[in-house]
Curated annotation (Swiss-Prot):
Gene3D superfamilies: EF-hand, Mitochondrial carrier domain. The gene is mcfO. Its main location: mitochondrion. Ca(2+) 3 binds at D360, N362, D364, K366, D371. Ca(2+) 1 binds at D145, D147, T149, Y151, E156. Solcar repeats lie at residues 436-526, 535-616, 624-712. It is a multi-pass membrane protein. One of its GO terms (biological process) is aspartate transmembrane transport. InterPro entries: EF-hand-dom_pair, EF_Hand_1_Ca_BS, EF_hand_dom, Mit_carrier, Mito_Solute_Carrier, Mitochondrial_sb/sol_carrier, Mt_carrier_dom_sf. Belongs to the mitochondrial carrier (TC 2.A.29) family. Residues 378-422 are annotated as: Linker loop domain. This is Calcium-binding mitochondrial carrier protein. It comes from Dictyostelium discoideum (Social amoeba).
Amino acid sequence: MFANRVRQAQKLYQKRFFSLGNNSTISKQQFKNSSNNNNNKNGGNKNGFYQKAFIATTVALTTTLLTATTLLDDNTNSEKEILKSQRQTFEKYASTTLEGERQMTAEDFLSALTTLESDKQSGEHEILKASLDADKFKVLFQMADVDHTGYISFDEYVMFDELMAKPEAEYFLAFKLFDRDGNGYISKNDFKHVITASLDPSIPFNFDCELVNLYFGDGRTELNYSQFTQLLKDLQQERIKQEFKFHDKYNSGYIPRDKFAKVLGSVKLRKIPDHVRDKLESISELNLLSGHPNEVSYSQFVAANDMLLHIPSYGRVLKAAILKNKKDNINKEEFLTEARSSTSIEITPLEIDLIFHLFDLNKDGKLSISDFEKSTGLNINKIGGGTNYSDSYPSDSHVTIQNSSTTPSPSTPITNTAAAIALNKKHGKTFAQQVLESIENFALGSIAGGIGAAAVYPIDLVKTRMQNQRAVDPAKRLYVNSWDCFKKVVKFEGVRGLYKGILPQMVGVAPEKAIKLTVNDLLRDLFGDKSKGEIYFPLEVLAGGFAGMSQVCVTNPLEIVKIRLQVQSTGPKVSAITIIKELGLAGLYKGAGACLLRDIPFSAIYFPTYAKMKTILANEDGKLGPMDLLLAGAVAGIPAASLVTPADVIKTRLQVKANAGEQTYTGIRDCFQKILKEEGPRALFKGALARVFRSSPQFGVTLVSYELLQKALLPDAEYKPPTNAPITQKDFDVIRGNTNTVQRVIDMESKFGTLHQTRDNNKSSNGGENKN
């Protein structure tokens, strides 16, 4: 129902005004039908080879579909909450009933528009009402009253609210205000009329400038919506350029420093922290030797304008440069070098001079994070990618928050990335401290690995026995399937039989998981882009592959002992010590090649998938709960475990001692060829399902335990999860909830120049108050 309203709104506004874009959506029912159709196609051949061979892949796809369905349900719940809020607001202010349906009058609509989140803000409520003059309200009401009845129905209110929630709402409002005759185009006369009424008449705007002539030609060209939005962007630069010329009375290329600060402060395409705004006039100090101590040159004016547009980007550059140079502060050359290597922003030496002049508080020629944060009010740890940095400023700081992008977008929470975590590391740690930290992480990884292995060990035993079953004749097979194997082990060997060989497993899994997690972390940190908190995907896979390779030298000897203990069912039992003596040092590494073929691809698939799942499951604050981590680990284990099953089967066959009359193998190739010849390709996927059901929860439990143990046992230690993928989860509620329509109008006026100086002009005409 809600989605239908949105689509109706889009169609209505497309027809009435202009195209708002096409949103392609797939309903949940279509999604389910598609899934069912696929299942029906595959269901007719349940006993076929391909289904059995790739059964784990099917499980992985099913899990992916279930995850997608869950995400769709989450979005649906969010939409229901929004609709509920819209209904509550409408019912609160709608005072008229027509034909049995509640309706809003113009006064009701005005009250609804100017309502803030808190009813306690009644003073601001009245200010918003006062700021919405008759002309602007008329435009808004006409936009909402689609059927021209003079009243607003609930459906119309929802449509209007949906439109105002769009990121381009401010452009849309500006377009409607400029389009005086409502024909969907902006003429040069429309443009001149609004701009003339909006700007300060004491600084006339030259409508015969090159910019206006390029857009409107000889005056007969009219602009559609898209063309108009580009004009609004370019208009800002033209305004300040003309204002500079106006204040340059003697054509000297300099203007008074107070006029310089006023002109730059009048443009609302950026955020200007109060500390920076107050220091803009001090830029004139750089001209003491040139004979213009109280003036600012045009080159400085242009450089300062560019600099103010990119303050958050400079914060990222500073952070990356300090990490790269391993120093607490950097000089101009180091800053410029990092800026050119890590950003697409072209920074000039003059801009560098201005940056250090404004932000270098102690004037030592070096810039530190502390200097930057004190000068700007920015929290440098919260600076992420993109152009909207509202959350980078502390809530109690006195910072003028202005849109930093020419395309308006709702503020989104920006969470810490791996680079931000790395930035929090204390510089100058002693070697002993670093060693202690590594030991702590290793110990936690060992304990977590043991917990994960013990939780799923019975499944591992069943998997090993199924893979080792070599008889081709069904009559000679000891186990029909994994479930039959499980039942027979419990029946003939007892519950304790399910845990045969667990001691070597516990001894081996601790260093295995600890080494794997530690190496993966180390390589991700080495390969990653610290300035952005990101890692190139092929390098991410490479890090996982090396992590898997690093564990084999330690775990292969213990695993071969474990496997030989697991396959002992009846008859005389052989101890682990006896097995070790029998094999010798060389024998303990039997099957190591197959082990590498299994573990390297497994880790190369698992760790990037786990990192990606963490980003998907993170909440609006970028945080994950224990169940989120468990699910991320479990889902990542599905493709990783299933796709490397053939290597695991070969490894098991090579490491198990063949009984009398059973086939023996001389190596990986020999084993592979004999299995294909004697048992068929399906034998390469024996135990695939058990492996999936073992590996997925095992690694999920391991990683959850790792992170929870670190929080519980080392709460004051630096938090370092097994994978440090950056989390950038957008919050749907924030996108919808922090938007007030009247505030949109005010922001639009400030941004695009419409009615920008009107309030000051009114004050001047009403008694000359606040002439400054």
